[in-house]
Amino acid sequence: MRLQTAAGWRKLLLSTLLCAGALAKKDKPSVKSKKFDFIPQRVQYFDDSDVILFEDGMDHVVYRSDNAGEHWEKVTAAPEGKVRGVTMHPFDSKRAYIITTEKTHWRTKDRGEHWEEFATDAVASIFQDPLSFHAGDPDRIIFNGMDCTGIFCEEVVSSPGPFRDRSV
């Protein structure tokens, strides 16, 4: 094989160096496991990070890992037994919401490092997704709730309400 141009030699040298670098790498992937007494539900990554949230459907609590699942901690902001679900913000990769069975819920703007409480005028709807998001403004969120009197429930909607960042 004759390489008559400088570009040909460069390609050969580059491919040789890439192969040598790949063979010299000693790191192997590591797999770690954690056993829970329940089946984790709705395991969700925050985009572009190693932070994961999941729900414990038996005790109705949320767990968080900031190292791709090697270590887990309960999210203590939301009361145990009251978590209905976790909703990730589809247009802001640092935000998530813990929706409870009551009128008090929690939100994070930093991938779950800190949680802020917010209140709604109704409990979250069981008939549709509790939150709907605006693609262009992460603070414009529609809360779908229910106002129940006796055995009858009426659907209610609020926006932006508690989601608007009041520090601005």
Question: Each predicted region: which residue ranges?
Answer:
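Extracellular glycan-interacting surfaces
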Residues: 2-168
